[in-house]
């Protein structure tokens, strides 16, 4: 069951969403998929709210949704009801103002002008692509994925635009995640080729 936390309840928070968990259990839901939980980029933002797929920090919770403790409490309540929780993982790209843009600009795909570029075939000008030929980026992203399993207790990921990231990255990351606990990996991909 997909949850866009900021629109799921009037409050738009993990705390408010957790109140709805017994109802979802009664409906027969077994897995909850939280759309991106991370802070949303402000540079080149689409609309007033921005796209949750324009991630500003892979290791932070969007403060509009709550805190890490709130997320952890949501997951714990879901687990107590026999529900599993996966979060959306946006591994191909970031917001223009992602912390990595300042800390590691070399981790971004570059256009002919040497500047970071958005994915060319979509109207995704609010995000820029990462360059998975960089081993340090691969380590960072794997560690960030492990962080949410360890710190929030999530049960896996729904991976956005999975085909834009090399398969060997997903193979390696999945092995590392499953060394922590069994995780569920759901991937999304639409090829324009």
Predicted segments with their positions:
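Short, polar loop motifs at secondary-structure junctions
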Residues: 189-193
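Short catalytic-loop micro-motif centered on adjacent basic/acidic residues
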Residues: 86, 156-162
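Substrate-binding/active-site clefts of carbohydrate-active enzymes
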Residues: 6-15, 19-30, 36-152, 172-179, ...
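Glycan-recognition and catalytic cores of secretory/periplasmic carbohydrate-active enzymes
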Residues: 167
